[in-house]
UniProtKB/Swiss-Prot annotation:
Residue ranges that the UniProt entry lists as topological domain Intravirion: 23-49
Gene name per UniProt: OPG059
Record's protein name: Protein OPG059
Assigned GO CC terms: host cell membrane; membrane; virion membrane
Family: Belongs to the orthopoxvirus OPG059 family.
Topology within the bilayer: Single-pass type II membrane protein
Originating species: Monkeypox virus
Amino acid sequence: MVIGLVIFVSVAATIVGVLSNVLDMIMYVEENNEEDAKIKEEQELLLLY
């Protein structure tokens, strides 16, 4: 009973950790994409002048 509970808690903690890592990666990638888009726009504006 106790061992099963410990295993369940550890598995749940592992799943939560993996999900938080995945969310962090998604947020990081989206931020980088926005920065890349801004840089491209700035480069295009500089080329126009």
